[in-house]
Amino acid sequence: MNSTGHLQDAPNATSLHVPHSQEGNSTSLQEGLQDLIHTATLVTCTFLLAVIFCLGSYGNFIVFLSFFDPAFRKFRTNFDFMILNLSFCDLFICGVTAPMFTFVLFFSSASSIPDAFCFTFHLTSSGFIIMSLKTVAVIALHRLRMVLGKQPNRTASFPCTVLLTLLLWATSFTLATLATLKTSKSHLCLPMSSLIAGKGKAILSLYVVDFTFCVAVVSVSYIMIAQTLRKNAQVRKCPPVITVDASRPQPFMGVPVQGGGDPIQCAMPALYRNQNYNKLQHVQTRGYTKSPNQLVTPAASRLQLVSAINLSTAKDSKAVVTCVIIVLSVLVCCLPLGISLVQVVLSSNGSFILYQFELFGFTLIFFKSGLNPFIYSRNSAGLRRKVLWCLQYIGLGFFCCKQKTRLRAMGKGNLEVNRNKSSHHETNSAYMLSPKPQKKFVDQACGPSHSKESMVSPKISAGHQHCGQSSSTPINTRIEPYYSIYNSSPSQEESSPCNLQPVNSFGFANSYIAMHYHTTNDLVQEYDSTSAKQIPVPSV
């Protein structure tokens, strides 16, 4: 297609006319360059629109359905209704408006497109774009309010949230309808470029003001959230101030110690001002108490408090990274269209470059709608993992690689050599393969085993696990480090040790390290016999 034909039909966008004194070969060269640039723009926009249609439709569809499927999640707060509204707007943009825009790209003017199609595209694109952006701005203001602690105990009621959503829909589509009615039928089927002069300019100016205000609100809000979280993370990195005072209750007080212990508190601010460390300390205490009557030492509570502080610091750091990603995505995806719209409002004559800029700006706005479910939803990490898994699976299919297993031998030699070794030889591998029953072995560093053959009853493991040095197997094959305090096994009773207590030292954070020892049925049989010998377990 000829790009000059686009510009002749588009208002405020005139082709680059060549003076009559120049030769015809320079004119043809310039037209050829314009055709090349326009073709590159079409190819780039088409590729991005294909990605938007696939990933954006998938992500928004999953997020939208999760609010109606009881097997997924439900509203944690009433304001989660805004996430539902955002997913619906973005789903319509990615699944309907983006394919319509792809159809518009490959036609020179609106004269070759049906009027009903062009009217529908005008209304849906301009309406859903500003509606999605307003919803993102409202979510940003709500999160900023929660982080700054403005009335943290008072959440928005469900009727108020619904009324706010209806107000956003009314304002957005009123402006979109006015802009659609003021379009010219003889120009390009683009929402903003086809506005006629006069009242069309006034509506376009109002649309630009609304668009710019929403972008500014989102950017400033998440910048303030990132600064607040960064300050909280810096404060938590300082050594905690431990004070003991049993006479009066203090904020951020720890779990009271039974049997004469003193409550422990820390002068550390929480992420939200209505949040303290009681819940975190409760999570930490559950992993190390065998019974409710067991005493908790002050050193153990102190270690739990330090672990809670480290967890909050890590969460603040991840939240800061998320805020930076949100700000960059908003600026990169919204600024090109905003600049082109401002240029259309301020100048009566456009240019070929401005027209290409506007096409690319609309594509980036649609691309932002495809990114929203991977950023704003509570299951965004799961969606990203699924997409990465699909990409890896496709890559393996292209390269025809065999799927690798998670267990790999770490010792010298191949598996056949290790399999043929006798039981008294030391292989120093991550796992041992032998047809003969082994009497001296433990689970490996690649993860705890939850199979039926490797499980021991809780009574046996509780009464006959000893801590001592082993002379046959290196200690590095017996320890499994975990770098998260969350339980990574299906059942806490089977995975957490029952005889290990936190050490009175700050050198090791025991909430981040778990020791898993499992034996096989051979150990169960040895326990039943009178001549059984217990396997010594190394101490930390």
From Swiss-Prot:
Keywords: Cell membrane, G-protein coupled receptor, Glycoprotein, Membrane, Receptor, Transducer, Transmembrane, Transmembrane helix. GO terms for biological process: chemokine-mediated signaling pathway; G protein-coupled receptor signaling pathway. Gene3D superfamilies: Rhodopsin 7-helix transmembrane proteins (1.20.1070.10). Residues 1-15 have a biased composition (Polar residues). The chain crosses the membrane at residues 47-67, 87-107, 121-141, 161-181, 206-226, 319-339, 351-371. Glycans are attached at residues 2, 12, 25. It is a multi-pass membrane protein. Residues 68-86, 142-160, 227-318, 372-540 are cytoplasmic. One of its GO terms (molecular function) is G protein-coupled receptor activity. Residues 1-27 are annotated as: Disordered. It is found in: Cell membrane. PROSITE patterns: G_PROTEIN_RECEP_F1_2 (PS50262). One of its GO terms (cellular component) is plasma membrane. Its main location: membrane. Expressed at high levels in brain and spinal cord and at detectable levels in retinal pigment epithelium. In situ hybridization of adult eye sections localized transcripts only to the perivascular cells, surrounding retinal arterioles, in the ganglion cell/nerve fiber layer. Also expressed by islet cells (at protein level). Residues 1-46, 108-120, 182-205, 340-350 are extracellular. InterPro entries: GPCR_Rhodpsn, GPCR_Rhodpsn_7TM. G protein-coupled receptor that is activated by the chemokine CCL5/RANTES. Probably coupled to heterotrimeric Gq proteins, it stimulates inositol trisphosphate production and calcium mobilization upon activation. Together with CCL5/RANTES, may play a role in neuron survival through activation of a downstream signaling pathway involving the PI3, Akt and MAP kinases. CCL5/RANTES may also regulate insulin secretion by pancreatic islet cells through activation of this receptor. Belongs to the G-protein coupled receptor 1 family. This is Probable G-protein coupled receptor 75.
